[in-house]
Amino acid sequence: MRTRALCTVAGWAVFFCGVCLLAGEAKLPDPHYDFEPNDPAWLKQAVQFHGHLGPWAAAGARLAIAARDAAGTKGYFDLEVIVEGPFAQPPKSCFLDGVQVATGATWGKRNIEWKPADQIVVRVRNLRTGQVAEARPSDELIKLATSFKPKPKVSDSGDSSAEEERHDEELEALARKIAHLPAESLGTITLLKPREASKNSGDSAR
């Protein structure tokens, strides 16, 4: 009987130690990012979500912030987002991560949709008022997002080479330029009526 009691106590001790261990280990993954004093607060949140500081994610966030503000939404639950563009694969598809961070719309909540298209458009609809804002990037924003060389291949040893480090630094520099672009350089923001938004969505996806 005493042996059984000791085993029970030991079992519970192991259980609680395991729970404490799991609780202590619960944390988000560490992104590849060194914060700089001039970085806006939203950039740090975007990097935490995306994993590193890249120009396409930064571009998506900037353009989506502008559209969200123009539509008059608070974000997360009071909006629907439609994104159009050539985002089938990275690095361009990283744009979609930036949009999710900036609007709070996510695929889990089913309030964001991507439609393949040649031209980039971010369309935000305010669910409370019906107001729709459509954002299209400027040539300057697109030029910044695309002006980097492909990442060099990883060496057989798996170690980061000096060339890879330079590539990452270039990406981060471009992303920071996008983060600090004047609002008027981001692109055009147009306020649409719901019927106009539906028509434009169909036209631009063709």
Where are these regions (language model features)?
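Leucine-biased recognition of intrinsically disordered, low-complexity hydrophobic segments
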Residues: 6, 21-22
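Non-transmembrane, aqueous-exposed alpha-helical and coiled segments at domain scale
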Residues: 24-53, 59-206
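Bacterial N-terminal signal peptides
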Residues: 10-20
